[in-house]
Amino acid sequence: MELQLEHLSKTYGTVQALKDISYTFKPGIYGILGANGAGKSTMINLITDNVARDKGSAGGSILYDGQDILKLGSRFRGIIGYMPQQQGFYEDFSPKAFLRYMAEIKGIKGKNEKGQTVKEQIDELLEVVNLTGVAYKKIGGFSGGMKQRVLLAQALLGDPDILILDEPTAGLDPKERIAIRNYIAELSRNKIILFATHVVSDRMYS
């Protein structure tokens, strides 16, 4: 399993956000550390195909196991799990309803490799992010940290090979931050995890 960036570049008008980035990611955790505006989110948006690359060879390429992600189409959506830094919610949705909704959007059906139904996967993820007790509460009343945990759970739906996490511990208290970091560290044994942050301590895993 490999994710390759080859001469990746991105410009917005006259501003060069990324220039000639090349790297090969294999299973493990990779911290993308930088100040706000350093290009972390731009790189993530290119990998998740939420932003178009520069035209032609100037934009470079992104390959998953040797294939350009643009040619993988919808298949790549099942390979990647993305937790954005911010996302709008239907405020009347509960975490459980939101995760069911996201599972449908991602086309997650039937049972996974562990034999779990979608409902069982959702229940397990809610436990992982410590939201079981508020599984049926409206997200509109949640704190910023609780909303972050809902977003992390949706990124993990379907057990993707690649996890892209943009500021995943923002808004969490120290205890929650450590718990989430440790869980992500466990997942990294057989996943490629890109972890964008401006918090230096988030590079440290036990």
Residues covered by each model-derived region:
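Walker A (P-loop) phosphate-binding loop of ABC-type ATPase nucleotide-binding domains
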Residues: 35-39
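Helix-to-loop junction immediately C-terminal to a conserved catalytic motif
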Residues: 48-49
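Conserved ABC transporter NBD signature motif
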Residues: 56-71, 75-76
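Conserved ABC ATPase "signature" region
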Residues: 100, 104-107, 111-134
